[in-house]
Amino acid sequence: MRETLEALSSLGFSVGQPEMAPQSEPREGSHNAQEQMSSSREERALGVCSGHEAPTPEEGAHTEQAEAPCRGQACSAQKAQPVGTCPGEEWMIRKVKVEDEDQEAEEEVEWPQHLSLLPSPFPAPDLGHLAAAYKLEPGAPGALSGLALSGWGPMPEKPYGCGECERRFRDQLTLRLHQRLHRGEGPCACPDCGRSFTQRAHMLLHQRSHRGERPFPCSECDKRFSKKAHLTRHLRTHTGERPYPCAECGKRFSQKIHLGSHQKTHTGERPFPCTECEKRFRKKTHLIRHQRIHTGERPYQCAQCARSFTHKQHLVRHQRVHQTAGPARPSPDSSASPHSTAPSPTPSFPGPKPFACSDCGLSFGWKKNLATHQCLHRSEGRPFGCDECALGATVDAPAAKPLASAPGGPGCGPGSDPVVPQRAPSGERSFFCPDCGRGFSHGQHLARHPRVHTGERPFACTQCDRRFGSRPNLVAHSRAHSGARPFACAQCGRRFSRKSHLGRHQAVHTGSRPHACAVCARSFSSKTNLVRHQAIHTGSRPFSCPQCGKSFSRKTHLVRHQLIHGEAAHAAPDAALAAPAWSAPPEVAPPPLFF
């Protein structure tokens, strides 16, 4: 009781003597209130009591003084109660004791001297807005609720990468959980394909691909998507947004995964090696496409002609051939008639040409052909020039023609027309020779072909005196001097100097004879053997001896015959040893071509 009176006196209240209070139930109630206060802190915070009698007039003064500091506070509701329900002395005792204990608790909170805070082996959490609120700088020691935050530094963004795919993670635990999906150990597996997922919601989204459900349509085009994230990513193609810039070169990308793949070009990282050869790749998709070369897999098949492709983009380009009818192929004997009109050597792409040049309006079926054509309009012009003439220098846009209209084909000289190398769809032959009607799939091949008729051989071997009409033939011939045989057979290990020779040899193991004669139905493993065989039916002997005039159906027979005259091999003029111009009589149908 003395402590209570001293506390009231320290607050500026005038407190009477204890004997002034009546020795009745209020004193006992006051004593009971003190016992309840010491038993529980919750009862001290209530500040409401009941069951006491009204104070005497002498105590009224004390009650008014006790109520004075409560005006406008939480105990204002107690004033509306009848007098005597909550004695002011008891309330003041509780109020003072609670405030004193809270103040003492705040003063006693100190970090013990015998304890120290050690750095945790786990990575520091991302404080985010807490770091800004408490003014904690990354990597610098700080204080949060009395605990020293020392040793916390900025972590790498995603230091742990998955070896199976290109995803990266911030901690090893998440990486291990992700790797379980590659092993098929996820808790949620798709009942249709068996793919594993860590969450059931992800599995439900995946099952839309099996049902064909695409609930998110694009407002700009007709495409629909199974996930909203895919739609958001697709919309960037319409808006042109590229929110992910490269820190090295400033190039921007629409997807974060594309940025990660691009950054490997700066670091030189190629984490995906081929198990069959020594090549390495930056993306796993590139590795999968490359491995089809070793396995021979062609998973993309055309529904109209059953032709297969290794890449999906090759199938898409091929399908343009079927969208519109291609040009009619001229017959081989169309040039025999002097009044027949020679077919135009201008290439015709048998399908839509969606890639148009913005400068001259010329359209192309392939995007890379458009890029090659646009070099004519830019300053670099033709970066690959001829060492012997001016062909290949920078030309103007009007000078760019698909092919030369001269019957002799494009020449090599300052006044010759430039040739834009164009390519027909894979397997199609849209470039035809006006002299013999032979078709080619590439404009450059047609540009080299007239040398067969003119006998021109501009490429000479430095080891011997032989000359060739094309550079690839010269390169293949040079292997005869060096002994290089880079093409090996996987079945028997035999090596060849040319890839075509290897392909011809592999028919021995497979037993394939795709070239059949249209007259006798005899099959051959190579087209060359078929052409030689057809000379039996046509009676053609294109190789004649200049000494005696005897003709032969094969060049090797002519060379062997010339030994009789005492001449060395290959002594005949180049024009006489040119490729034979096979002329089939009208009664013999030309053989079908198999490619």
UniProtKB/Swiss-Prot annotation:
A zinc finger (C2H2-type) spans 160-182, 188-210, 216-238, 244-266, 272-294, 300-322, 355-377, 431-453, 459-481, 487-509, 515-537, 543-565. Residues 325-343 have a biased composition (Low complexity). Interacts with STAT3. Enhances STAT3 activity by keeping it in the nucleus. This is Zinc finger protein 467. Coiled coil: none annotated. One of its GO terms (biological process) is regulation of transcription by RNA polymerase II. Its main location: nucleus. The keyword Ribosomal protein does not apply. Transcription factor that promotes adipocyte differentiation and suppresses osteoblast differentiation in the bone marrow. Enhances the osteoclast-supporting ability of stromal cells. Binds with STAT3 the consensus sequence 5'-CTTCTGGGAAGA-3' of the acute phase response element (APRE). Transactivates several promoters including FOS, OSM and PPARG. Recruits a histone deacetylase complex. Belongs to the krueppel C2H2-type zinc-finger protein family. GO terms for molecular function: DNA-binding transcription factor activity, RNA polymerase II-specific; RNA polymerase II cis-regulatory region sequence-specific DNA binding; zinc ion binding. One of its GO terms (cellular component) is nucleus. There is a cross-link at K97, K368 (Glycyl lysine isopeptide (Lys-Gly) (interchain with G-Cter in SUMO2)). Residues 1-67, 313-350 are annotated as: Disordered. Keywords: DNA-binding, Isopeptide bond, Metal-binding, Nucleus, Repeat, Transcription, Transcription regulation, Ubl conjugation, Zinc, Zinc-finger. Pfam families: zf-C2H2.
